[in-house]
Amino acid sequence: KSIANGIDIIRIFDCMNDLRNLQTAVKAANKEKGHAQVALSYTLGDAYTLDYWTKMAKDVENMGADSICIKDMAGLLLPYKATELVTALKKAVKIPVQLHTHYTSGVASMTYLKAVEAGIDVIDTAMSPFALGTSQPATEVMVETFKGTPYDTGLDQKLLAEIADYFRPIRDDALESGLLNPKNMGVNIKTLLYQVPGG
């Protein structure tokens, strides 16, 4: 139903990176002519080497995924590690690779910069009223960062400012009503120690 209702990219993931749990969803997305994007749930530990990630990426490509997303749900991927990971994945597979991270630990914008320089195809961002903290880096900041470089997005900052102006009072209402917790909008460097996702 998602594809029939207009969703074009179906991001599919298993928090334990057990690809057997993804096969049915990938087949269904392919059957319905959707874009099956399989996410690799990024985490840290001795087992999670570049070989681990590249093997998984190849398996995902062979499964029929249209693209891969590095899903860094806790904001653990550090900038220079992003360079290594993206470089390895881009060599391992032919399909596009996207990066999704959270600003929880405070390093996300730097991670995106290094990932883009390493050849990542897409980065996930959020409009500034809802950016940072457990969300993503601000769209406007990333657009301005890459302006005039080979990575220039071509997006119009005036239009982005209008969009941000539209959403700012919605954010303020959500804060005032308690729907949005202000604690979620800050940085907690301890995330790099306890490694629990917050986004």
Language-model region placement:
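Catalytic cores and adjacent flexible loops of soluble metabolic enzymes
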Residues: K1-R11, C15-G199
